[in-house]
Amino acid sequence: AGDAVWAVGHDGTILNSRDGGLTWVVQREDVLDTSPDAAFDPRQGVPLLDILMLDANHGFAVGADSQLLRTEDGGATWTFVSTTQAAASSPADDQASQTEEVGNDDSWTLSEDDLAMEDVSDPHFNAIARTGSGALLIVGERGVAFRSRDGGASWERIELPYGGSMFGVIGYEGDHAVAFGMRGNVYETFDLGESWSAIDTGTDLSL
């Protein structure tokens, strides 16, 4: 949107620059209130991990614990959006998953038990992208993915062939998109997630 850029981070922070990044203003932050009489809000203090602006006014931010926020005024205000299916089970729930967490020792070699997630009721949403057709895709941990064909008004859970975390997604022309994540896994779709094809990266490193 011209010289306007956005960035997201910890404590639900959203920053905006109107001059190409020379100066920034805080549009939103949601720092965890640790005072003794504070009401518990599980969304407080949760980091945001990606942001997608569709134009100068409309956009979405995604983050940990299935956070999905929407703005219609250039980021002046943000509201929570429910995918309604974020906690739904999927075939990936029956697989041993792979997460970013490491054990308490100094070893970087993890067993499948080490990589298994105990609670995936609110999986992290790691990235969001728009395809050339205008559809939106969200990817997250443990193979979680969602798509929207109506500009984010409604969301549909879709299946990825890999049950580990996906860290990014890129939208191309039409319904073409590429998702990438743990252990060098990259998958490509030409039909907005109806089917996926693996792309050999030649690496087991996370992407």
Task: Give the residues covered by each predicted segment.
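Residue-level hotspots at or immediately adjacent to binding/recognition sites across diverse folds
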Residues: 1-207
